[in-house]
From Swiss-Prot:
Signal peptide (from-to): 1-20
Protein name per UniProt: Ceroid-lipofuscinosis neuronal protein 5 homolog
Stored InterPro entries: CLN5 (IPR026138)
Regions that span the bilayer: none
GO terms of molecular function: hydrolase activity, acting on glycosyl bonds
Gene coding for it: cln5
CC terms in the record's Gene Ontology section: cell cortex; contractile vacuole; endoplasmic reticulum; extracellular region; lysosomal membrane; perinuclear region of cytoplasm
Organism: Dictyostelium discoideum
Amino acid sequence: MKRTIIILLFVSLFVTFVLSQIPDNDPELCQQRIQREDCPQTPVPWGTFNDNDEIEVYYMQAPVFEAVFGNFFGKLGGYHSAIGFYDLTTGLNYTAEYDAFFEVGNGTLPNIINVDGKDELLWCNAGILCTVPYINETYWDKNIYSTASKTYMGTINGTQLNQYIEWMQQYNISNPVYQTWDVWNNYGQDLFVPSTTCDDFTQQSIEHLGSIGINYNCSTVFKRDYINLFTEKPQPIDFTEHYDDIFKFYEAVLEIKEGSIAQIIERILSIIGLKKYIYVQGEYYLLELNYPFMNAKYDYITLPGCPANGIDYENGNFIHLN
């Protein structure tokens, strides 16, 4: 219960960002509070690399919400991640990362807005691949944020990087929605809904680079975040039939941040008696949560070609919804 309350308090931080960026009845409903110039609608392809370019690959992590909280969430294992490329031949550097286009809060929870006198749920949960021809050395610098890191993963050539660029642009097309939650029956084994976050992109980048020839040192520590829900198989429902219960649930979650700590805890506990829902690819699903209900993990990932020491994505029983 204590860990569940901590996770819900963490979610309430997301809620703060959600509610503060949407003015009441604003006709331009989904707007980025801060426009990321390095997150264009179409990712920068970086051009074509010479076949013999020597390029070092790095797995980069920095604490989430670092501008406000510094290292706080990094100490709890809460990170944003990206892949960095250092072209030793040309001296140029590149970053590839995936993010919520309208910020993480909107990728996690809806906004409740009034349309013609009726409350509606507005989701602004687009995901976007951000690619820039540089590496922000300050953001990923452990001398500035002690929990930040850049981990050398291996070296590739220009041909392999060109292949990766094609793959990452297809990833952007195939993953248009940011999904915060991994929805499991049993952690690491039975997965109903996979998340689509920065960590999923970096993990799949590492896997794809392995498939096109990078050789990993199996002693390299490769870890990532998971924000997990635990449930029996989610059941698809009709939105109109469940309208009232869906609104009660999301209103309760969105109100968590209001009031004193005691009131916040009271609101968290009040959610226990409500029906729980999740929104996946345009559909709502009813959840029957099971123990431990929800948690966050900073866990190992097995590198391609190495002995399993974390979640085995090749051999796991990934059930999914369909």
